[in-house]
Amino acid sequence: CDISNLVIDENARTVYLSDPDMSLDVGSVGKGYAVEMAAQAAEARGLKSALISVGGNLRAIGTKPDGSQWSGGVEDPWNASDVYTASSSYVSGVNMSDMALVTSGNYQRYYVVDGVRYHHLIDPDTLWPARYFDSVSVLSPDSGAADCLTTGLFCMSLEDGQKLIESLDGVEALWCTPDGEVIQSSGWADHEKK
């Protein structure tokens, strides 16, 4: 397989794989979409309170039965383990109801060649793993949108990402940079656990 066999027609907004042995993995957005569809189906059947957790994607339906908000955490990418548990360290905790919290990062899905770690989030400009961030998290009413946004934000500059997030109603983001800085969008703190 060769990246040159990926034919992108921006005008027609199409993608074509000219090599029949190639396939496209939609995992970067498919999981968020599936979580959102599951949440919407559950709500349509009358479910009023739930927290759906699917590998880095959290989707809150309503509030907890006691009326309090659900809690979610953004795992510390610099001290991450292979499996997120209650004892994992985090850089931000959020309260949420009828919201999704999705994180994309470079610390769980990667491989090492000659001592160099290569993660799975590819910068479309360089065709190499993106180097802007160690993780990006998004809060959004829609898990599918949040999943798309985390992947996209991971592959763009902080300035461009901040402009994008600030242009979207009801959407917030948190960026963890390779130098250990945690940067929040203007409304992230409104959701942060006190």
Residue locations for each model-derived region?
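Mature catalytic core of soluble alpha/beta enzymes
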Residues: C1-K194
